[in-house]
Regions:
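N-terminal leader/early-domain signal
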Residues: 1-175
């Protein structure tokens, strides 16, 4: 009886057939998702919702917007006037002083809330027009301050602001 060594247990014998590999069962490589800061759209009325970005780059997108800050026109910009409730009305530049997170879209002639754009979750029940201030835009200037104040006091807005503060304060690396 011949002694077998450890290697003989693992060496291939010519009688076995090689395992077949099927190229169709291999998973295709997913293209690498990249985000460039140049992809940032400054006008809030033209932006796509944050949740429409791939989850792999969503934080990068949020960080780029946070670094850029809210879109606020320079003093002297002429806001278009609309006939509303029997008067000519328009967005007022001094509202930026009271609401530092307020944004204005030239494309839609509408107001947006920066924190709500970044951290609004559309799956949650909508109260106080959260989606309007995050993605659609508010354009009823007669009651704008009343609506801004009501929304700013809402849990949705407060949570968005806290989430933004937490997001800005998180460490980018553990070292």
């Amino acid at each position: 009886m011949s002694k077998r060594t450890l290697l003989t247990y693992f060496s291939s014998s010519g009688s076995s057939t090689p395992l077949e590999t099927n190229d169709n069962t291999r998973q295709p490589k997913m293209p690498r998702v990249e985000f460039r800061c140049s992809d940032i759209i400054s006008d809030p009325g033209l932006r796509k919702p944050i949740d429409d970005y791939l989850s792999e780059i969503r934080d990068q997108v949020k960080r780029a917007y946070v670094l850029r800050g809210p879109t606020q026109q320079a003093l002297g910009f002429t806001y278009p006037r609309k006939w509303q409730s029997g008067e000519w009305r328009s967005f007022q530049h001094h509202w930026f002083e009271k609401y530092d997170w307020l944004e204005y879209s030239e494309a839609k002639d509408a107001a947006f809330f920066f924190y709500c754009y970044l951290f609004f979750h559309p799956g949650k029940p909508e109260k106080f027009s959260s989606n309007v201030f995050a993605n659609i835009g508010y354009e009823q200037w007669k009651k704008a301050l009343e609506k801004f104040d009501k929304h700013a006091a809402s849990q949705s807005h407060c949570n968005s602001r806290l989430n933004c503060d937490d997001f800005m304060n998180q460490r980018t690396s553990v070292a």
